[in-house]
Regions:
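Extended, histidine- and acidic-residue-enriched regions that form the cofactor-binding/catalytic faces
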Residues: 1-121, 125-294
Length: 294
């Protein structure tokens, strides 16, 4: 039986209209190409978010936008972390400063609102200090758009299902590896996992990857899919209970950014510099200091 196509970029207009009529929900997956150990594809974050969103839309309805692989890194605490966990290896990053990523997100919200979606689920597989900032931006935008908004950042797994009680293993640990293995098996190769401490820290690899489990990952992905389904249903109910608003223009978004969001930037977690940063000879030093702009 052929799969129902839910990927926006692969659908023709009548398919999009039919999917919209069935369930006017849109998934917006975000991520980053960055080090995730020598055993995982560098696009892990967006791959997980996109593939899991596709599963949710296939099972319960909705449309999935193309994954956005440009995300926040290098500045402030991100740069300090990368100096310690990646070092001078070529990182293969697709990084943006935080203000550019967050402003782009505002335009993504405007676009799906203009199309008439009732709910938008923003799923960022890439986490960091911005996990505190994205909800603040969405709270501002929510006051100006009809589409109801929900965001999830990180693995999105509501519980660790590993039976040994050791947890998910942190960044690029067994939790992320297990989830990626479940949805994109060609993007995980455990034979590449280092067997000793030579050249540590192993391209930012996390803990317990030797106990990664694809079958367990499928159970965990099912958890996430059902969570997304429940949130989507709540968004539709919230939309139906409100009066619609006028669609925003590009100029409207610029005004909202300049008057409501930009003044908040100095307080955003992703804009903080709370340490002395990488040493002067580190490749991570150049963008560590956060400029006063945006």
């Amino acid at each position: 039986m052929p799969r129902t196509e839910v990927r926006w970029e692969r659908m023709v207009p009548d398919e999009l209209e039919a999917a919209f009529d069935r369930r006017p929900i849109v998934y917006l997956p975000y991520g980053l190409c960055e080090p995730h150990g020598p055993l995982n594809a560098v696009g892990m974050d967006a791959l997980r978010a996109h593939s899991t969103s596709v599963l949710a839309a296939e099972r319960h309805g909705g449309i999935v936008t193309p994954a956005n692989y440009w995300h926040i890194h290098e500045q402030g605490g991100y740069g300090t972390w990368a100096h310690k966990r990646v070092g001078d290896a070529r990182p293969w990053l697709t990084a943006l400063p935080s203000w550019m990523f967050l402003k782009n997100m505002c335009y993504h919200i405007r676009a799906v609102d203009a199309l008439g979606f009732k709910g938008a689920l923003l799923f960022s597989g890439h986490s960091g200090p911005h996990r505190l900032d994205v909800p603040r931006v969405l709270n501002v935008m929510q006051e100006h758009v009809s589409v109801r908004l929900f965001s999830v950042i990180g693995t999105a797994e509501p519980q660790s299902r590993f039976p040994d009680g050791k947890g998910m293993g942190g960044h690029a640990g067994r939790g992320e590896t297990t989830l990626l293995w479940a949805v994109e098996p060609d993007c995980v190769d455990l034979s590449r996992m280092p067997t000793d401490d030579a050249d540590a820290p192993h391209f930012a690899m996390g803990d317990y990857n030797e106990t990664s489990d694809r079958r367990l990952g499928e159970v965990m992905v099912d958890d996430i899919v059902e969570m997304l389904h429940e949130e989507a249903s709540a968004l539709i109910a919230a939309y139906d209970a409100r009066d619609p608003r006028t669609t925003l223009t590009y100029e409207d978004v610029e005004v909202i950014w300049d008057s409501e969001i930009r003044p908040m930037l100095p307080d955003f977690a992703s804009m903080q510099v709370n340490d002395d940063g990488p040493p002067a000879d580190s490749r991570w030093r150049a963008n560590w200091a956060v400029p006063a702009r945006g």
